[in-house]
């Protein structure tokens, strides 16, 4: 059954509250200059009548859509298979919801998708954008800059040159990697390998650099490129065992890569951690707790990264300034990491 009752109007709210239509409009749209007693009367009338502001009309007044685009530079097959994205999206969604903003999810896989997203952002449909999982050759930053949309990036941007206008939230990938490798060294391991992430992403590059900070003279054959996926971890681990059968420890670029490596080690009859110690990165639950054995890993607060990205963007939108213009606030925010010890190392 369809409810055909007319929606309450601005005029009806004004009549109920005993104020002018202009006063109701200012209160509903967050304007200043209305006495507290009148604000309370308007809010009471809105609640009693069930009045819902017309978003299109409200946007004309506030120049805000109360919508934020979340752009993930990955195909949907990876986004919906990797818990990392779910955790980051959950953090973003919680923060946006708390401020009555809508999340508009945009995924990009190829050139056509990039052009589509660029047109959408330039079309004025959203107030700002949150962008993560960028690749070094990604055209999205240029498209976003052209669109003139306030943006916060997830992860350290990989562009060359001084871009002080870039706002980003990241984890201490390099420091976390150093902690992981130092732990393996402390266990007495000497043939410590690294299964990297996709090296066109700064998180993978930073973790590789952290490994190299500790393993200065490491055999280059101990570094094998993977792609942050379980299948990539399996391929890289098989390649590593062929190259360096004497490997006694593995630092994997993320937990999914580590889970693939653990499967291959088990198939090869290598005991973990007796024969080969394994450490991951992320501490994604339940993945890290359900591997066999449970995974020692570097914890980054993925959900908090998402919340902080959204918080920075909303704060800048409220102030009507770029993040760079906010005194005392750095353009890049780097969150700490922690080594979580379980049975694998």
PLM segments and residue spans:
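Periplasmic-binding protein-like
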Residues: 126-132, 193-195, 223, 244-254, ...
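Alpha-helical recognition/docking segments in bacterial nutrient-uptake
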Residues: 1-5, 67-71, 75-182
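Short beta-strand segments enriched in small/hydrophobic residues
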Residues: 23, 63-77, 183, 192-197
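Flexible loop/turn connectors
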Residues: 243-345
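Hinge/beta->alpha junction and helix N-cap segments in small-molecule ligand-binding domains
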Residues: 74-87, 105-114, 169-179, 195-238, ...
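N-terminal helix-turn-helix DNA-binding module of bacterial transcription factors
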Residues: 1-66
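Glycine-rich phosphate-binding loop signature in dinucleotide/nucleotide-binding domains
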Residues: 49, 187-188, 240-246
